[in-house]
From Swiss-Prot:
Domain NR LBD positions: 644-875
InterPro entries for this protein: Andrgn_rcpt, NHR-like_dom_sf, Nucl_hrmn_rcpt_lig-bd, Nuclear_hormone_rcpt_NR3, Znf_hrmn_rcpt, Znf_NHR/GATA
CDD domains, sorted: NR_DBD_AR, NR_LBD_AR
Protein name from the UniProt record: Androgen receptor
Modified residues (Phosphotyrosine): 208, 252, 292, 331, 342, 347-348, 378, 510, 527, 891
Residue ranges flagged as DNA-binding region: 534-607
GO cellular component entries: chromatin; cytoplasm; nucleoplasm; nucleus
Length: 895
């Protein structure tokens, strides 16, 4: 910051003098004001600083004081104290010399910054006469400037230590005065007492150190005028007592928690001199101290290491401890009383004025000098800025001073301006940014009561679709300001040493796939390179579902020939041969056994016959086996017989289940309607590709007519995506939010922002049904497959008969899955009723979303929402058929 010095008509502008920095500006400017001559003409009186009137009143009092009259009489009589004074009794030090007078040496006054000669100092200490320049002939009606302010009424630098000493930074002056006082006390104590008793004139030093506190107010007014002209605020100085205004290194406040470094201070000499000068101003100092007692009490405790105790002068007749104050800071101290400061410092609290009611002040700290403004500390006004938060509840973001609804903190009254979407019942949302915050500003909805919360506020299964729950450990470091622009996944559980799920034999549910941060929001490898569906027999690339299992073409042909043929294969080894892509032809017996174990069969009716054939083959080879091999054969038999309880096609459903698909949403950008809906459309396009692959791998689906296959997928894709999203929300975020994708999770704010809040609420309710009904992964897989065959045109499909048979087979498979877990027929019937009611509830949600997407497609150009090509074609061609009633869902129960 560069500021030209100048106070208008208060004093002449120095030619092109510039100071840099915030702190030296103030002190250097005041020094320039004092050292430059002020106005000397009558018209300059109107441009005097605000303290001019106060100076005139004090000057009038000084003129009538008996001491000044005595000094004036002594000056007229030619006494040694005949100093030249101004019209108001001030000590004139900088006046111009008269041409008629001989040019004398410049006066060396301690307050002028120059060091007097030793002889002059001794003479001044002993009260010897000194020559002073002649008075000026100009008009002296205007108040004198410069050091004439330091007249004979100056109170001895005691009460104005924070004003004059800090402004001029003349600590050496006090040392010189103290030395002179010691010389005067030691060498001329008797003569001094005699002169005081007889009313004899005293030295100029004694007169200089006597009087009232005129300079204190004058220096304050002058300091304020200079600071206002420079654009600096000095109101922070007014809130500190004089003892706390010593100038120091206030640019760099001590680090919190680190003991302060002791500053070099003028110890004993200055302390003794100051102790002797504080006698006549003790009352005022006491009042100033009591005025800020709440602040100074806690402030002094932290500065006990900086206090300096010194004994007073013996001549002063008092001995005490002098406590040097702390350094001066132009920034507001954290322990100051905020109430008084907010009334006068509007420009200082400019951010606070925009932020609404101020937060409670932080606990006092001995070195909390520099104000660290945090927008999260401004209470209710943070609601407007916190609307950009996408992954956290507002109640979990604000600090201890700003409380959300239901937090119970002192600033809960400001919760009226909080966004109405965030209620206390919503609980902890996705990825709390602030955590418990020491219990003060924890997440809303009871997160703060629980203290430390998990980083997600929920538990999710560690792997797969299992319902096992595992707790997360809170991450060590969160982002600053409570701002969460990245998804805070806990690093210990995200960094994996093994290969990702897309490298396994099949994609699986991708239960553990998480992205570290928003910068890692890249698509998984299965998006660029779709995972190769491996054959369950040899591990080669699978070509589809053959005979009830996902196999390659070679194993498909082998099983057909081996199962239909009459050949009996025997293993030359121990029935544990390795069957892979390169060694699958080495042992037909082990290969056929592995086909049976994978669930391959020529038909459901032949399952028992195939089991007997397998037992016969193993029985014929049992004569040459050991007891260990016989135990292994019994386990194989029991495993084959168990297929009657574990449906065969469940293995296929688990193998062909699509993996997790990312939306490619940029979470670093603020949420908007267009961005959220465009990301949802992009996610729908990517998921639709996986739905097509998944449907083609379903048992019996390829037997449908090609047109029927396309029609079924185009009509049921919305319901399938909603059903799968509800399951992901249940398994990943405990149905608290909508888990569309790892990089696109909808909390309450996003639900409102997307303008589809009612649809999102219904989808979240569907996700909660999975938990209330305790849906198992096997039931979910079968219900999802059945949902594909639950909507058809009113006119029917081209091969409606086969479609009905295929749908009935999937209904029977669902009933068989229910019967495997329950032995009571009544319990099975009740469970079947619950699951079918859940399937029926998906259709109204899908229809409502069809209407929303169709309306959005029409207005997409106006709202800047992007639709991928395939999504736009399906919505524009097939969705109108559903909305018009030409295509209707198939319900299990009457609606």
């Amino acid at each position: 910051m560069e500021v030209q010095l100048g106070l208008g008509r208060v004093y002449p502008r120095p030619p092109s003098k510039t100071y840099r920095g915030a702190f030296q500006n103030l002190f250097q400017s005041v020094r320039e004001v004092i050292q430059n001559p002020g106005p000397r003409h009558p018209e300059a009186a109107s441009a005097a600083p605000p303290g001019a009137s106060l100076q005139q009143q004090q000057q009038q009092q000084q003129e009538t004081s008996p001491r000044q009259q005595q000094q004036q009489q002594q000056g007229e009589d030619g006494s040694p104290q005949a100093h030249r004074r101004g019209p108001t009794g001030y000590l004139v030090l900088d006046e111009e010399q008269q041409p008629s007078q001989p040019q004398s040496a410049p006066e060396c006054h301690p307050e002028r910054g120059c060091v007097p000669e030793p002889g002059a100092a001794v003479a001044a200490g002993k009260g010897l006469p000194q020559q002073l320049p002649a008075p000026p002939d100009e008009d002296d009606s205007a108040a004198p400037s410069t050091l004439s302010l330091l007249g004979p009424t100056f109170p001895g630098l005691s009460s104005c230590s924070a004003d004059l000493k800090d402004i001029l930074s003349e600590a050496s002056t006090m040392q010189l005065l103290q030395q002179q006082q010691q010389e005067a006390v030691s060498e001329g104590s008797s003569s001094g007492r005699a002169r005081e008793a007889s009313g004899a004139p005293t030295s100029s030093k004694d007169n200089y150190l006597e009087g009232t506190s005129t300079i204190s107010d004058s220096a304050k007014e002058l300091c304020k005028a200079v600071s206002v002209s420079m654009g600096l605020g000095v109101e922070a100085l007014e809130h500190l007592s004089p003892g706390e205004q010593l100038r120091g290194d206030c640019m760099y406040a001590p680090v919190l928690g680190v003991p302060p470094a002791v500053r070099p201070t003028p110890c004993a000499p200055l302390a003794e001199c100051k102790g002797s000068l504080l006698d006549d101003s003790a009352g005022k100092s006491t009042e100033d101290t009591a005025e800020y007692s709440p602040f100074k009490g806690g402030y002094t405790k932290g500065l006990e290491g900086e206090s300096l105790g010194c004994s007073g002068s013996a001549a002063a007749g008092s001995s005490g401890t002098l406590e040097l104050p702390s350094t001066l800071s132009l920034y507001k101290s954290g322990a100051l009383d905020e109430a008084a400061a907010y009334q006068s410092r509007d420009y200082y609290n400019f951010p606070l004025a925009l932020a609404g009611p101020p937060p409670p002040p932080p606990p006092p700290h001995p070195h909390a000098r520099i104000k660290l403004e945090n927008p999260l500390d401004y209470g209710s006004a943070w609601a407007a800025a916190a609307a950009q938060c996408r992954y956290g509840d507002l109640a979990s973001l604000h600090g201890a001073g700003a409380a959300g609804p239901g937090s119970g903190s002192p600033s809960a009254a400001a919760s009226s301006s909080w966004h109405t979407l965030f209620t206390a019942e919503e609980g902890q949302l996705y990825g709390p940014c602030g955590g418990g915050g020491g219990g003060g500003g924890g997440g809303g909805g009871g997160a703060g009561e629980a203290g430390a919360v998990a980083p997600y506020g929920y538990t999710r299964p560690p792997q797969g679709l299992a319902g096992q729950e595992g707790d997360f450990t809170a991450p060590d470091v969160w982002y600053p300001g409570g701002m969460v622009s990245r998804v805070p996944y806990p690093s210990p559980t995200c960094v994996k040493s093994e290969m990702g799920p897309w490298m396994d034999s099949y994609s699986g549910p991708y239960g553990d796939m998480r992205l570290e941060t928003a910068r890692d929001h890249v698509l998984p490898i299965d998006y660029y390179f779709p995972p190769q569906k491996t054959c369950l027999i040899c591990g080669d690339e699978a070509s589809g579902c053959h005979y009830g299992a996902l196999t390659c073409g070679s194993c498909k042909v082998f099983f057909k020939r081996a199962a239909e043929g009459k050949q009996k294969y025997l293993c030359a080894s121990r029935n544990d041969c390795t069957i892979d892509k390169f060694r699958r032809k080495n042992c037909p017996s082990c290969r056929l056994r592995k086909c049976y174990e994978a669930g391959m069969t020529l038909g459901a009716r032949k399952l028992k016959k195939l089991g007997n054939l397998k037992l016969q083959e193993e029985g014929e080879a049992s004569s040459t086996t050991s007891p260990t091999e016989e135990t292994a054969q019994k386990l194989t038999v029991s495993h084959i017989e168990g297929y009657e309880c574990q449906p065969i096609f469940l293995n296929v459903l688990e193998a062909i289940e699509p993996g997790v698909v990312c939306a490619g949403h940029d979470n670093n950008q603020p949420d908007s309607f267009a961005a959220l809906l465009s990301s949802l459309n992009e996610l729908g396009e990517r998921q639709l590709v996986h739905v097509v692959k998944w449907a083609k791998a379903l048992p019996g689906f390829r037997n449908l007519h090609v047109d029927d296959q396309m029609a079924v997928i185009q009509y049921s894709w919305m319901g399938l995506m909603v059903f799968a999203m509800g399951w992901r929300s249940f398994t990943n975020v405990n149905s608290r939010m909508l888990y569309f994708a790892p990089d696109l999770v909808f909390n309450e704010y996003r639900m409102h922002k997307s303008r589809m809040y009612s649809q999102c609420v219904r989808m979240r309710h569907l996700s909660q049904e999975f938990g209330w009904l305790q849906i198992t992964p096997q039931e979910f897989l079968c219900m999802k497959a059945l949902l594909l065959f639950s909507i058809i045109p009113v006119d029917g499909l081209k091969n409606q008969k086969f479609f009905d048979e295929l749908r009935m087979n999937y209904i029977k498979e669902l009933d068989r899955i229910i019967a495997c877990k329950r032995k009571n027929p009544t319990s099975c019937s009740r469970r079947f009723y619950q699951l079918t009611k859940l399937l029926d509830s998906v259709q109204p949600i899908a229809r409502e979303l069809h209407q929303f997407t169709f309306d959005l497609l029409i207005k997409s150009h106006m709202v800047s929402v992007d639709f991928p090509e395939m999504m736009a074609e399906i919505i524009s061609v097939q969705v109108p058929k559903i909305l018009s009633g030409k295509v209707k869902p198939i319900y299990f129960h009457t609606q």
